[in-house]
Amino acid sequence: MSDVTVNEREEPAGVAVAGAGVDAGAAGAGAATADETPTQGTLPRSQVHVGEPEGDPLMDAQDLIAGYLPGVNILNGASLTLHDGEIVGIIGPNGAGKSTLLKSLFGLVHIRSGKLLLRGEDITNMRADKLVSRGVGFVPQTENVFPSLTIEENLRMGAFQAPKLFKERFEYVSSIFPKLALRKGQLAGSLSGGERQMVAMGRALMMKPSVLLLDDPSAGLSPMLQDETFIRVKEVNRAGVSVVIVEQNARR
């Protein structure tokens, strides 16, 4: 079992973090449970360590302070370390700042203080399109497909920075999500919730990222579709993609 520790500093914790290596299954994932009295509206100061990974971190978020409104911090000194091959899960109550953390890692929420590194490069507040070119993908929780476009057209949107590589990347994504190739002409708006998640993840994988940020991919899905979603996440991880996932069912 992977060892996970959350070292609290000043604020009471509002999240817990689970970590698993590439080959770790649900039963093998370690989890740290934070203070049971959460701080609504702020993600706490926490430092995450998963097992004893080798080498330098792939992504390293250090003491991030961020928020949407002037003077109102949602992240209040949050730190997270992701190594090659890991799946790091972030869990916590609604309003704790989990989605805000992912958005700050993807350049969608301004980081007011702290530092974000990718392979040692400072990417703090880098634009999302620049992060995509550096190997970071993001799948939002809602409105994560273009409903009036076909599956194939959605995937083409994911390869907008490398259109000449579309065929190669489509084959790569289809190897993980075979259904997408079989139904590539179907409108994304006609798909079920689980199928939309496959399209959204597939689109994020079209640039072959090394880091994939997933925001609650099983939200609103039936238990059966949740199981299928987690199987796909593990397949993505086995394909060489490190994952940071916000998930209420992180134990899976």
Specify the residue positions occupied by each region the protein language model found.
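Glycine-rich phosphate-binding loops of nucleotide-dependent enzymes
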Residues: 3-4, 18, 35, 41-252
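N-terminal intrinsically disordered, low-complexity tails
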Residues: 7-34
